[in-house]
């Protein structure tokens, strides 16, 4: 029987910082993302505006892709496509091939996208717009905004719960959590 060890995100980031070496490059791990049902680890390099896929043991970079500005968030759909949002240059959403880590398309996604989530029930992408104080529902096939919902002040993060039927939106300024319900 294999034992599973849970490492807090803070400890994992410290582990990566201590073991990560790349000649003559500034690397500043900022965010961690899991994909492929927890089998793939991605790390953002804020200084280099990169998304890096790490080896399963976390010791080596397998692949990396560069963007026009730092990556704020990442999600993966049921088909394995990755999508990331970057807030520079008036906000961009990139669609990536999950295996090759190559950019398939990019679109403007609001001025300040701070988080992105794929919802399997609505088959939509949900993007928080930090300084617009909104949650956007985007159709992945057409890449068009379907719905805009006001959600308090500076939404920075979200999490699905109740079997993906609800979203909890975390706001940055004063304690104002909001809940947005997904249409089924």
Language model features: what each stretch is:
Residues 5-14:
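Sec-dependent N-terminal signal peptides
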């Amino acid at each position: 029987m294999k034992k599973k060890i849970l490492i807090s995100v803070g400890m994992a980031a410290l582990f990566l910082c201590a073991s990560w070496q790349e000649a003559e490059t500034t690397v500043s791990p900022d965010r961690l993302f899991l994909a492929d049902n927890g089998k793939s680890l991605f790390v953002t390099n804020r200084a280099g505006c990169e998304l890096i896929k790490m080896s399963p043991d976390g010791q080596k970079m397998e692949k990396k892709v560069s963007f026009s500005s730092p990556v704020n968030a990442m999600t993966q759909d049921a088909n394995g496509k990755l999508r990331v949002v970057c807030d520079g240059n008036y906000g961009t959403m990139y669609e990536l091939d999950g295996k090759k880590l190559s950019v398939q398309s990019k679109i403007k996604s609001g001025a300040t996208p701070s988080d992105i989530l794929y919802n399997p029930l609505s088959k939509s992408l949900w993007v928080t717009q930090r300084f617009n104080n909104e949650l956007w529902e985007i159709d992945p096939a057409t890449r068009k905004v379907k719905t805009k919902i006001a959600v308090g002040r500076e939404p920075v993060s979200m999490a699905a719960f109740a079997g993906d039927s609800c979203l909890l939106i975390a706001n940055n300024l004063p304690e104002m959590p909001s809940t947005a319900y997904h249409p089924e």
